[in-house]
Amino acid sequence: MFSEQAAQRAHTLLSPPSANNATFARVPVATYTNSSQPFRLGERSFSRQYAHIYATRLIQMRPFLENRAQQHWGSGVGVKKLCELQPEEKCCVVGTLFKAMPLQPSILREVSEEIIPPVSAFQHNLLPQPPRSKYIHPDDELVLEDELQRIKLKGTIDVSKLVTGTVLAVFGSVRDDGKFLVEDYCFADLAPQKPAPPLDTDRFVLLVSGLGLGGGGGESLLGTQLLVDVVTGQLGDEGEQCSAAHVSRVILAGNLLSHSTQSRDSINKAKYLTKKTQAASVEAVKMLDEILLQLSASVPVDVMPGEFDPTNYTLPQQPLHPCMFPLATAYSTLQLVTNPYQATIDGVRFLGTSGQNVSDIFRYSSMEDHLEILEWTLRVRHISPTAPDTLGCYPFYKTDPFIFPECPHVYFCGNTPSFGSKIIRGPEDQTVLLVTVPDFSATQTACLVNLRSLACQPISFSGFGAEDDDLGGLGLGP
Amino acid sequence: MGRKRLITDSYPVVKRREGPAGHSKGELAPELGEEPQPRDEEEAELELLRQFDLAWQYGPCTGITRLQRWCRAKQMGLEPPPEVWQVLKTHPGDPRFQCSLWHLYPL
């Protein structure tokens, strides 16, 4: 749609300079509200245990699950607590899942000094486990916990797919061996959604993630500069410039700095060797500041921090500090926002993360496709169910802010290996566009979301590298 | 031989004189009549707060103050007992009332 619009205009490149220059005014953002307030942390206190998050998660999700259970299994189904279970009686139980994974990295196992020969094949007492891409194992077990008790689950439940921290309702009965035999289970499914007001013109939002500055690769820098030039309307014909003027916002979804800026070799070296060296992230942040300056001079930009960015590690990640961007903060169009980011742009609700939640679920579940995992988090009604267990999280005590209070129209996650987009429907006619924004430093691809039609289109920028042999195809070779 | 030498032998021996009824604390009672009643009331209030801490319906009690836990329960619609709020409001700043049962233990 972007390039079709562009192709319709008359070609003006390769023609003598004209007396009058065409100007294109960027579409103004009619309404924008940033609703990431639940993810902002004020005074932080870490002298609390994580039991509070789990307790509030269960208390908040219980009514949703009881409703869904009654919709699935009839309104007469009895929802019981684990302490009220009678053997062989079919009922429904609502609780939080815990997956006991022997391969899960455990600091206690790493530092334990037992030299007793391992009982099971995968207990490495002497060496720390090497990082793997997936930590699932056929021997994983699922345990359902409610406020007071826990019970092991068996039966028709997909152990490898589910992860710790999911709140669900199971239907079945408890057996003589003390385990709960599951016949069916259900999640909280999509939250209620307010319909988006219809728009009259095409407006686009550009989603980019994984710029990966400071990584040392010149390839991605060219791609980044091309991206900035397209958005600011300095590239292409009048058609492309006109289309670029329809981009009303740019969201940078995390990993603006590359993983290599986080190298901590200087810690192991002697002080006299590292005295004058700067951290790699300093140079990278300067480059980022210049790019943001070019972008924010022309279009509103929202910058979300990611896994390798200089902000806190635990979710929700707080916005990058404006002192790092002395040039770009002069423009009010630059907005530094939190990691799970929620906003309403022209009536369309956006919600997205920089990808840590999806990649953590990828490590501990058998689901392979990031888009499938993204859809699954929406169906479970929780942005990041693994949050305190395997993904760092702030110890909330009042509410769990990662539960979806209402369903967004566009739900994205950044730093995925490839681009994907899908429209899903909910049980109450909710429509959500799911977008997995690929890592720009690897794929040179960004996503354009059309707010009017809720469709998503990839846009890729690539230059001809030295190793490209496409030049032969162009007829330039000997 | 006498008994073994204990370290307490280096301290002077002081024996408290027992009152005629066998209790030495009872002397104060007739002089200040109001003391035992507030103490009983306080004890009853502290007991109420301790029961509130141990009630499982309102979630974990460690790491947060009783007022925070009461407000959280109220916001979630769990209907915590209003008497607890009254007691907490009448004794602001007193750690025996405001902090949970386990606040002296780290985490």
UniProtKB/Swiss-Prot annotation, chain B:
One of its GO terms (biological process) is positive regulation of endothelial cell proliferation. Ubiquitinated; undergoes 'Lys-48'-linked ubiquitination in response to UV irradiation, leading to proteasomal degradation. This modification is partly mediated by RNF8 and by the DCX(DTL) E3 ubiquitin ligase complex (also called CRL4(CDT2)). Efficient degradation requires the presence of PCNA and is required for the inhibition of fork progression after DNA damage. Signal peptide: none annotated. Induction: In response to DNA damage, genotoxic stress and replication stress, following UV irradiation, ionizing radiation, treatment with methyl methanesulfonate, hydroxyurea, or with aphidicolin, protein expression drops to undetectable levels, due to proteasomal degradation. This down-regulation is ATR-dependent. It is found in: Nucleus. Residues 1-44 are annotated as: Disordered. Changing residue 7 to A: Complete loss of PCNA binding. Keywords: DNA damage, DNA excision, DNA repair, DNA replication, Nucleus, Ubl conjugation. The keyword DNA damage applies. Changing residue 74 to R: No effect on ubiquitination. Loss of ubiquitination. Pfam families: DNA_pol_delta_4. Transmembrane segments: none annotated. The keyword DNA-binding does not apply. Changing residue 4 to A: No effect on PCNA binding. One of its GO terms (cellular component) is nucleoplasm. Residues 15-28 have a biased composition (Basic and acidic residues). A motif (PCNA-interaction protein motif (PIP box)) lies at residues 1-16. Belongs to the DNA polymerase delta subunit 4 family. Component of the tetrameric DNA polymerase delta complex (Pol-delta4), which consists of POLD1/p125, POLD2/p50, POLD3/p66/p68 and POLD4/p12, with POLD1 bearing DNA polymerase and 3' to 5' proofreading exonuclease activities. Within this complex, directly interacts with POLD1 and POLD2. Directly interacts with PCNA, as do POLD1 and POLD3; this interaction stimulates Pol-delta4 polymerase activity. As POLD1 and POLD2, directly interacts with WRNIP1; this interaction stimulates DNA polymerase delta-mediated DNA synthesis, independently of the presence of PCNA. PANTHER family: DNA POLYMERASE DELTA SUBUNIT 4. As a component of the tetrameric DNA polymerase delta complex (Pol-delta4), plays a role in high fidelity genome replication and repair. Within this complex, increases the rate of DNA synthesis and decreases fidelity by regulating POLD1 polymerase and proofreading 3' to 5' exonuclease activity. Pol-delta4 participates in Okazaki fragment processing, through both the short flap pathway, as well as a nick translation system. This is DNA polymerase delta subunit 4. The gene is POLD4.
